[in-house]
């Protein structure tokens, strides 16, 4: 509790608002597509119960930081809706959403590992009003699951938060694409912002850049300036 209080003070003094907290689980690996299927999110049955409990602890932490929403990669959603793992994910998400509901918060699914149509179907099957989408356009490209601008239109009613991130398409089947500095990849960031305006999105633009060391901060600052320029060009504040 003392450390939490110190963290809250540090955040306030820096002028930040915590809008979302990501649930990340021990044992996950994004080395390649097959490893992602085996290790990431709530999909693996052997770790599902433990990770649901971890997600609820993450939700408690987010609440203590001021009521932030929670987001996560839940893993590859099976295409077959009769698959036991599909049903297991539906049950898990209902449990998590119901846990968040009394405090008026959302659980947001991060895009990338399935098509927009498959994610839309899954959201309908979970059937919880506080289940939304954290839309990451780069992930759609990195996993090769669809054009991000088109996908944003499909998922528009559920988009509660977004990542401003860029990347290139995978070089071949079973491989992942390569993340790039914002504006240097194949997302088309200006088109992405234009589409956000078109669908009426007015939430935060969260820059994500997964590189080590000082390069990450350099790229964060570059992305911030790029977004300011593009927003001015598009006539939005």
Give, region by region, the residue ranges found by the protein language model.
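Aromatic-lined substrate-binding rim segments of carbohydrate-active enzymes
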Residues: 1-15, 20
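Residue-level preference for long, well-ordered alpha-helices that form the structural scaffold
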Residues: 1-3, 44-51, 82-85, 89, ...
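Histidine-acidic metal/acid-base catalytic patches
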Residues: 5, 12, 66, 94, ...
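Active-site acidic/histidine proton-transfer and metal-coordination neighborhood
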Residues: 13, 28-132
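A cross-family glycoside hydrolase active-site/sugar-binding cleft signature
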Residues: 19-24, 71-73, 108-112, 134-136, ...
């Amino acid at each position: 509790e003392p450390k939490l209080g110190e963290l809250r003070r540090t955040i306030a003094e820096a002028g930040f608002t915590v809008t979302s907290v990501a649930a990340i689980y021990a044992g996950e690996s994004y080395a390649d597509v097959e490893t992602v299927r085996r290790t990431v999110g709530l999909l693996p049955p052997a770790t599902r119960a433990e990770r649901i409990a971890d997600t609820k602890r993450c939700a408690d932490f987010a609440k203590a930081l001021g009521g932030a929403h929670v987001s996560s990669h839940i893993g590859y959603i099976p295409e077959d809706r009769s698959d036991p793992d599909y049903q297991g994910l539906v049950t898990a998400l209902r449990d998590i959403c119901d846990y968040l509901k009394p405090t008026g918060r959302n659980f947001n699914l991060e895009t990338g590992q399935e098509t927009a149509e498959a994610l839309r179907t899954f959201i309908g099957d979970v059937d919880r009003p506080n289940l939304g989408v954290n839309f990451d356009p780069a992930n759609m490209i990195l996993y090769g699951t669809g054009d991000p601008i088109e996908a944003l239109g499909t998922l528009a009613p559920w988009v509660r938060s977004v990542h401003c991130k860029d990347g290139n398409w995978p070089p071949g089947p079973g491989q992942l694409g390569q993340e790039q500095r914002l504006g240097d990849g194949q997302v088309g960031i200006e088109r992405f912002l234009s589409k956000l305006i078109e669908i009426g999105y007015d939430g935060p633009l969260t820059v994500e850049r997964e590189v080590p060391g000082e390069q990450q901060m350099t790229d964060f600052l570059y992305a911030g300036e790029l977004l300011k320029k593009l927003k001015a060009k598009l006539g939005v504040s």
